[in-house]
UniProtKB/Swiss-Prot annotation:
Protein purpose: Bifunctional enzyme that catalyzes the formation of 4-diphosphocytidyl-2-C-methyl-D-erythritol from CTP and 2-C-methyl-D-erythritol 4-phosphate (MEP) (IspD), and catalyzes the conversion of 4-diphosphocytidyl-2-C-methyl-D-erythritol 2-phosphate (CDP-ME2P) to 2-C-methyl-D-erythritol 2,4-cyclodiphosphate (ME-CPP) with a corresponding release of cytidine 5-monophosphate (CMP) (IspF).
Protein's recorded name: Bifunctional enzyme IspD/IspF
Annotated spans, 2-C-methyl-D-erythritol 2,4-cyclodiphosphate synthase: 247-406
Organism: Rhizobium leguminosarum bv. trifolii (strain WSM2304)
Pathway stated in the Swiss-Prot or TrEMBL entry: Isoprenoid biosynthesis; isopentenyl diphosphate biosynthesis via DXP pathway; isopentenyl diphosphate from 1-deoxy-D-xylulose 5-phosphate: step 2/6; Isoprenoid biosynthesis; isopentenyl diphosphate biosynthesis via DXP pathway; isopentenyl diphosphate from 1-deoxy-D-xylulose 5-phosphate: step 4/6
Length: 406
């Protein structure tokens, strides 16, 4: 018997629109609202993580403002994923930003595209699967929406009510708005070529182009964070359901000194008449801190991950070790809150280099410099340290892990 060929699952590209300035949310040192912190992470990170863990998503492009390169790079430090995330600069309007994202995906092997506002972090896979099912069944354009429940009034310019508008067949549109890729790209290109740049969502462009738009049920939680109060409420929502899980790890290391031209401590080279002896660069401070970080999630110690018997680590920069440990912490759901290093040495003097060391720790760990501490003391000429035969380091790391549900 002749069998019909089975349908191929959709291969979805994701366009996340994050180029807006968000004036209604007020100014903040954290930047535009998509970079504000909720539940310990930037808004855009929550949005990205939802898509990165959704199987049909094969390509993700984030449309950002040209001024936000550093903000976006900092946000990405919260994410560990094999899913590639690419960026493209947006335009003056949302419509132009979306077109930039679509053009970036043009040469990718995708069948469909989901276009989503970065500041809608509370969608879920149930909604995404509902959209995918509609696309898989042949819909060219899919709009998640919820029926309007408020009573609607039409008023004149003076604020006088003219009439009550029937709510029947009225819906509030949400994102991700989803389409057959070539169909929406063509519609966007035609809208741009015609001089239209005033569309406020992508379903409107589909309607203008004569493409049927299918509604699927949205979710009440899938709200757009628009004003400052929205962001505060989102933070409360994410934080209230979690119990804090604060962990502290300790690390200790020591390396011998021998004749040389300097030592590397916390990634900073200090000229000296001795050097530290070791398989790698022998940065005793970073080695101790690596162990402290690994201890917070029970991930062994530095020797487990970088055996001194392995020739590939001979002479290696210890930055590799500390960044690896920080990555493991984040993979386990941890946020590094504080890193403290105490160096015990008779020489060289650490004080003149302390700020440079703190800056390096901040860079390696992806945390603010105020969360990085470096201290030093001598051993009062006692023992091997006192005899200038070695340098020791003690490190403490404080990490908050994603809590458990109450």
């Amino acid at each position: 018997m002749l069998q019909m060929p089975s349908k191929q699952p959709i291969s979805a590209g994701i366009v996340i629109v994050a180029a807006g300035r968000g004036e209604r949310a007020g100014s903040s040192k954290e930047g535009p609202k998509q970079y504000r912190m909720i539940g310990g992470k930037p808004v855009i990170v929550h949005t990205l993580e939802n898509f990165m863990t959704w199987e049909p998503a094969t390509e993700i492009v984030v449309v950002i403002h040209p001024d936000d390169e550093a903000l976006f790079a900092r946000a990405l430090r919260h994410i560990i994923s094999a899913t590639p995330i690419e960026t493209v600069h947006g335009g003056p309007t949302r419509q132009q930003s979306v077109l930039a994202g679509l053009r970036h995906l043009k040469d990718k092997r995708i069948s469909h595209v989901l276009i989503h506002d970065a500041v809608r972090p509370f969608f879920d896979h149930v909604l995404l699967d509902r959209i995918a099912e509609s696309l898989d069944n042949g819909a060219q354009a899919v709009l998640p929406a919820i029926p309007v429940t408020d009573t609607l009034k039409r008023a004149d310019s003076a604020g006088t009510v003219l009439t009550t508008v029937s709510r029947e067949h009225l819906y509030a549109a949400q994102t991700p708005q989803s389409f057959a890729f070539e169909t929406i790209l063509d519609a966007h290109e035609k809208a741009a070529a015609s001089g239209r740049s005033d569309f406020t969502d992508d379903a409107s462009i589909a309607e203008w182009a004569g493409i049927p738009v299918t509604i699927v049920a949205g979710t009440p939680d899938n709200v757009k964070l628009t004003v400052k109060k929205d962001i505060a409420m989102a933070d409360d929502k994410l934080s209230a359901s979690l119990l804090p899980d604060v962990r502290t790890g300790n690390g200790y290391d020591v390396h011998q000194l021998e004749a040389g031209d300097g030592v590397t401590l916390c990634g900073v080279f200090i000229p000296h008449d001795q050097k530290l002896k070791g398989h790698s660069d022998a940065d005793v401070a970073l080695h101790a801190l690596t162990d402290a970080l690994l201890a917070t999630c029970g991930a062994g110690d530095i020797g487990d991950h970088f055996p001194p018997s392995d020739p590939q680590w001979k002479g290696a920069a210890s930055r590799i070790f500390i960044e690896h440990a920080a990555r493991i912490v984040r993979e386990h759901g941890g946020t590094i809150m504080n890193a403290d290093v105490s160096l015990i040495a008779e020489a060289p003097k650490v004080g003149p280099h302390r700020e440079s060391m703190r800056m390096r720790l901040s860079e390696y760990l992806g945390i603010d410099i105020e969360r990085c501490s470096v201290k030093a003391t001598t051993n009062e000429t006692i023992g091997f340290v006192g005899r200038r035969e070695g340098i020791a380091a003690i490190a403490t790391a404080t990490v908050v892990y994603r809590g458990v549900k109450r």
